[in-house]
Curated annotation (Swiss-Prot):
Portion annotated as DNA-binding: 94-153
Name of the molecule in the record: Oocyte-specific homeobox protein 5
Low complexity bias (residue ranges): 62-74
Source organism of the structure: Mus musculus (Mouse)
This protein's GO CC annotations: nucleus
Chain's gene name: Obox5
Subcellular location field: Nucleus
């Protein structure tokens, strides 16, 4: 009996394997690809070919695609687009040339500017004819000179302000009293008179206390307490009948220029003047009469 065509050894082995075991053996990749293409319509032959490529081949394809995109991006721009580009030269506006005036022309214009900063149309026309320029140029010159004049005035005002501040400060310092000297001389705790004064000013007393001031001025110079002593803070002040010492307060605070001052007459004078002038009791009686 003639034998059939001989099969490949692998096929013979596969045919001898039972059906159950054959179903468990994985199929070849080609058959799997064909089955996947038939089942999923989204899979294209190009994608299957790319997936079957090795990693170096994929990298080469990606580099080629990137190079082509770069070449397309670096294509020369059209002339129309180049003309629309804005460069530093294109952004500059067209500027007219400045009109240059001679010294005589400037002198003439300055003379008319000093007379009138806002000339009328007739005056502008006359100046344009005499100078040899257009009316617009004359208007521009007057406009620029007015702005320059305002700037100069503003600078002069700013320079004058510090000087005026210095003068006012000097005046305030000259009128500001360096301190006040409250002097209290009392008998049994009663104040005699009060007032305010500085080194460069006379004492300021209330109207009800002017009579006591006149009493102080009328007394003898040896027995009275001189104003210089009070200003220096060395006034010898004592009490009269009770023998108690008077409270003398000397305030040197510069900020308090109008502090109340209680001025009293000193009962005890230097020892060499005890015998001259009225006694302390007589002076005390006069002060009480004035009140």
């Amino acid at each position: 009996m003639a034998e059939g065509p001989s099969l490949h050894p692998k096929l013979q082995v596969a045919s001898n394997i039972p059906i159950e075991i054959r179903s468990q053996i994985p199929q070849e990749p080609a058959r799997n690809l064909a089955f996947q293409m038939s089942q999923s319509p989204l899979v294209t032959p190009g994608s299957t070919m790319q997936s079957s490529l090795s990693v170096p081949e994929r990298n080469l394809l990606q580099q080629e695609s990137e190079g082509s995109s770069r070449q397309s991006g670096s294509m020369p721009l059209s002339d129309k687009y180049v003309n629309k580009q804005t460069g530093p030269m294109a952004s500059r506006k067209f500027r007219k040339e400045r009109t240059v005036y001679t010294k005589e022309q400037q002198r003439l214009l300055q003379k008319h500017f000093d007379e009138c900063q806002y000339p009328n149309e007739k005056k502008i026309m006359e100046l344009a004819v005499s100078v040899g320029v257009t009316k617009m140029e004359i208007k521009i010159w007057f406009k620029n000179n007015r702005a320059k004049y305002r700037r100069m005035n503003l600078q002069n005002i700013k320079q004058a302000l510090p000087e005026s501040n210095g003068i006012s400060k000097a005046v305030s310092e000259s009128t500001h009293f360096p301190g006040s000297i409250p002097v209290v001389a009392s008998d049994n705790g009663e104040s005699m008179c009060s007032g305010t004064f500085g080194e460069d000013s006379m004492p300021k007393f209330n109207c009800s206390q002017e009579s006591s001031l006149y009493c102080f001025q009328a007394c003898d110079g040896d027995m009275c307490c001189p104003q210089e002593y009070l200003l220096d803070g060395h006034a010898p002040v004592t009490a009269w009948n009770s023998g108690q010492s008077a409270a003398v307060e000397y305030q040197t605070d510069i900020a308090v220029a109008e502090a109340p001052v209680r001025l009293a007459y000193a009962a005890q004078a230097p020892e060499d003047a005890h015998n001259s002038g009225p006694s302390a009791d007589e002076l005390w009686q006069r002060i009480l009469e004035d009140f």
